[in-house]
């Protein structure tokens, strides 16, 4: 039989990781109510009767703030490993990180100047 020594725990983890979500979905299919009555089709709105339609337009400003947040969140993901390995990387990596931060600061200044961060 094919055997990889030391990988038994990993194989067990993979089996459990695949079995738990499948078991949860199957349990939901068995236990969940089947019928969709009129009251169950209504949109839930803090326990009150829904007012207006469920589809509303959001201001584009929400998307702009979300985009700026994602950009700086990704910056954190890239800078954290660099900060952890800072002592071993040397001067070239430090200069590269400074260039990366400078590009992001320029992008932030551009967004600020264009009014993307203004809430009006």
Curated annotation (Swiss-Prot):
It is a multi-pass membrane protein. The chain crosses the membrane at residues 10-30, 64-84, 89-109. Keywords: Membrane, NAD, NADP, Plastoquinone, Quinone, Thylakoid, Translocase, Transmembrane, Transmembrane helix, Transport. It is found in: Cellular thylakoid membrane. GO terms for molecular function: NADH dehydrogenase (ubiquinone) activity; quinone binding. It comes from the Bacteria. Its main location: membrane. It catalyses: a plastoquinone + NADH + (n+1) H(+)(in) = a plastoquinol + NAD(+) + n H(+)(out); a plastoquinone + NADPH + (n+1) H(+)(in) = a plastoquinol + NADP(+) + n H(+)(out). Its EC number is 7.1.1.-. GO terms for biological process: photosynthesis, light reaction. GO terms for cellular component: NADH dehydrogenase complex; plasma membrane-derived thylakoid membrane. NDH-1 shuttles electrons from an unknown electron donor, via FMN and iron-sulfur (Fe-S) centers, to quinones in the respiratory and/or the photosynthetic chain. The immediate electron acceptor for the enzyme in this species is believed to be plastoquinone. Couples the redox reaction to proton translocation, and thus conserves the redox energy in a proton gradient. Cyanobacterial NDH-1 also plays a role in inorganic carbon-concentration. NDH-1 can be composed of about 15 different subunits; different subcomplexes with different compositions have been identified which probably have different functions. Belongs to the complex I subunit 3 family. This is NAD(P)H-quinone oxidoreductase subunit 3. It comes from Prochlorococcus marinus (strain MIT 9515).
